[in-house]
Amino acid sequence: MRSLRGAMMVVAALATASALAEAPPNSQPNPFRTVENWFKLPAGRMWGSTSAVDIDRGGTSIWVAERCGANSCAGKMDPPILKFDQSGTLVKSFGGGMFVFPHGIAVDKDGNVWVTDGQGREGKGHQVFKFSPDGEVLMTLGKAGVAGDGPDTFNQPDDVAIAPNGDIFVSDGHTPAMGNARVMKFTKDGKFIKQWGRHGSGPGEFEVPHALAFDSRGRLFVGDRANNRIQIFDQEGNFIDQWKQFSRPSGVYIDNHDVIYVTDSESTDKPGYGYNPGWRRGIRVGSAKDGSVAAFIPDPLSPTADGKLPGTSAAEGVAADAAGNVYGAEVGPKTLKKYVRK
C-alpha cells in the first residue's frame, strides 16, 4: 500500500482533481494482476450476479451478497450472504429465502452485516436488513414487498453505509428519471431523521444514487451513476463537491487510509444508456483526500473504439482488504474476482 499511496502523492503534485476531470484517466498504470476462480463455493453451488462486496473491520474477511446462482433470488432458498476467509474458503452463509435482489452490502464496526434488497416480488424486497455476524436479523427497514417514497418505505434501495456514530444512510432509487432518487438518514435504532435528493443533475440531485461510502473525515460519497459523477456531502446532506474523474460510478469503497476505489461497469461510446464517451470501464484507484487518480484496473469487457460492447459489465461492487488486495463483484459475468499486487 505504501507504493500506491506514494504514487497518488505524485499524481496530486502534477494535477488537481479538476484538471484530471478534463480528460478520461484511462492510461494510469495497473499495478494489479487478476486471480481467477479464487473463491470456492460448495459443490453444486454456482455464482449468481454479484454487486455487493465488503470487508470486515479486521480487514481480512470478505463478505458478499450474490443473487442465488442467477440474477434474482426470487423463489430460491440458496443463502445469498456469504463470508469468505483469506484463502477464499466459504466459512459462513445465511439469508436463504429472505431476498429478491440483494444489491448493496456494508459491514459495520461491530461486525454486523447490512444488506439492501433492491427489488420487490411476492411480498418480499424493497428493504434493508441488519444481521449479526452469525446471521441473526437485528433490524429491518422498509416494508416487505412495498415500494414507496415515504420515510418508512423504499423503492429499489441501492446501498447502505453506517456512519461512525451508528447513523444509517441508504441510497434509494435504481431507475433513471423514475421512482426515487434520494439519500435517507436514520438513527442507529432505525428512526427516520431526514432525506435529500430528487431526479436531476444539479448539486444534491441524483440519477441512480448507486453507491455510498464514508471517508476518514466522515464525508459521505455518493456514486451518482447515471450522472457520471461522485457527489460528496456532509452528514446533514449539505453538498460539498462533485468529482467526475472516476467516471460512471457503480461501486465506491474507501479504506482506512482514504484510498478510494471506484468501479465503472457501464460506460460506453454508443449513445443511449451508459453513454460516457471516451471513458473505459474498470476500477479506478485514487485518493479520497484530493480526488487524484493513481491506478486503473481495466475491464476486459470494456467498449471498443467504435462503441460496441463485446460483453456485459464486469466489476460493479468493489472492496479492498488490509493487505491492499482488491475484490470486484461482477453482475454480468456472475463472479467475484481478486486482484493482487504484481
List the predicted regions and their residue ranges.
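Bacterial N-terminal signal peptides
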Residues: A7-A17
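Eukaryotic scaffold repeat domains enriched in small/polar residues
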Residues: E22-K342
